[in-house]
A protein has these predicted regions:
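Short, non-ligating residues that shape and space the ligands of small metal-coordination modules
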Residues: 90-91, 140
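Sequence/structural segment immediately N-terminal to covalent heme-attachment motifs in c-type
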Residues: 67-90, 120, 124, 163
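Extracytoplasmic electron-transfer domains, predominantly the class I c-type cytochrome c fold
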Residues: 98-152
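Extracytoplasmic/periplasmic copper-protein system
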Residues: 157-164
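Periplasmic c-type cytochrome electron-transfer domains
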Residues: 2-71, 115-117, 135-149
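Protein kinase-like catalytic domain
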Residues: 85, 151-154
Length: 164
C-alpha cells in the first residue's frame, strides 16, 4: 500500500514541480542553450505521435518512381526549405543552432518520416516551432512533391560511404 501511495504522489508531484519551475522562470526559454534530455525526448515523441496521427488517411497522389515530380520537389525544397533545413552544401547557417526546437538538418541526418508525415508538417505546420503552414502559400500538388523529396533525403555521410 505504501508503494502505491508513493507512486501516486510521484505521478502528481513530478508534473507539478516541472510546471512550477516553468511558471516561475526556472526553465530556460532561450533558443541557444541545450535543452534538458527529458524535454527533448518528450517533445520529439509528442511530435512523432502527432505527425503519425495527422498522416493517417492521407493518400499520396504521386508515384514513388515519378522522376519529374522528384526533380520538381528537389527544386521546391531548394527554393523554399533549404534556408532552414540545409542543403547538400551544408547545414543552414542559422537554422541549425538559432532555433529551438532545433530545425532538422535533413542533409546531415536524413529523414525518417514518410511522405504523408512530411506533407502534414508542410501543409499545416508544426506548433511551437518555426515551421509555419504552407497550405496558403503553395499548391497542394507542390506540397506533395516537396514531401516526397524530403521523405527520400538520405544523410550525406551515408551516401559518401556507400560510394566508396
Amino acid at each position: 500500500m505504501k508503494l502505491l501511495i508513493a507512486f501516486i504522489v510521484g505521478l502528481v508531484a513530478a508534473p507539478t514541480l516541472v510546471a512550477l519551475a516553468g511558471v516561475t522562470g526556472r526553465l530556460p526559454s532561450d533558443a541557444m542553450s541545450e535543452p534538458p534530455k527529458w524535454e527533448s525526448s518528450v517533445g520529439m515523441r509528442a511530435l512523432e505521435a502527432s505527425l503519425e496521427g495527422r498522416a493517417k488517411g492521407l493518400e499520396n497522389p504521386i508515384a514513388a518512381n515519378d522522376a519529374a515530380a522528384f526533380a520538381a520537389g528537389q527544386k521546391l525544397y531548394a527554393d523554399n526549405c533549404a534556408g532552414c533545413h540545409g542543403s547538400r552544401s551544408g547545414p543552414s547557417k542559422w537554422g541549425a543552432s538559432g532555433f529551438y526546437p532545433r530545425v532538422p538538418q535533413f542533409w546531415q541526418k536524413g529523414t525518417d518520416v514518410t511522405a504523408e508525415q512530411a506533407y502534414a508538417a508542410v501543409h499545416d505546420g508544426i506548433r511551437y516551432s518555426g515551421m509555419g503552414a504552407w497550405r496558403d502559400l503553395m499548391k497542394d500538388d507542390d506540397i506533395w512533391k516537396v514531401a516526397n523529396f524530403v521523405a527520400r533525403i538520405k544523410p550525406m555521410q551515408s551516401a559518401s560511404k556507400s560510394a566508396r
